[in-house]
Amino acid sequence: MINKNKITLKPLRDEDIVLFSTWLDKNYIYKWLCPDGEKQREAWLDQVTNKNGEFDFLKHFLVYYGDRKIGYCLYADCFFLKELEEEGHDFEDLYGDVTEENHTYEIGYLIGEEEYLNKGIGKIIVQLLEDKIIAQGGHEIAADPSEENIISIKTLLSNGFRKKSDGDYRKTIA
């Protein structure tokens, strides 16, 4: 049984990028995060390393269970995200309706350690991200899972998200 209180989010550090890269290479993660292949994988690594500050609006975290690193998550202000060009994503199409900063935030998450899959941790991660976005003053949370990613969609729906369109799930929080 998972103890919800032992799950925490801590900012991703430079030394965590190797672990994140290892998780990206796992088939069950790669198929959802990198459906367009290696260019998309490299884009993920560029975003988490953020060498030139271009991705400062992306907030990256590692998910811990106690002291063990078990996953990754992020949130991003969609006002800035809609300007990002990334293969496989049309953020302008998704978030063109976002007209102000600090209103709508996109979230993403993964469980990198297989033994922690199917234990309800995704639901807890979404709740912890929601708490962070509320603390920022956000009003809406968005997620863009593939429609084939049934587990992720069920996690979002169980957290109060509603389907706006294929690959666009939203939750009003304030």
Where are the language model's segments positioned?
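Conserved GNAT-fold acetyl-CoA-binding loop/helix
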Residues: 28-49
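Conserved beta-strand-loop-alpha-helix junction that forms the acyl-donor binding cleft
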Residues: 112, 143-153
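A short helix-loop-beta-strand connector motif used in the catalytic cores of GNAT acetyltransferases and
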Residues: 48-62, 71, 79-83
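Conserved acetyl-CoA-binding loop-helix of GNAT-fold acetyltransferases
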Residues: 118-132, 154, 158
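Conserved acyl-donor/pantetheine-binding loop and adjacent beta-alpha core of acyl/acetyltransferases
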Residues: 77-109, 117
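Conserved GNAT acetyl-CoA-binding A-motif
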Residues: 133-145
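A short beta-loop-alpha structural element at the N-terminal edge
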Residues: 7-22
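Conserved catalytic-core motifs of GNAT/GCN5-like acyltransferases
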Residues: 144, 157, 162-174
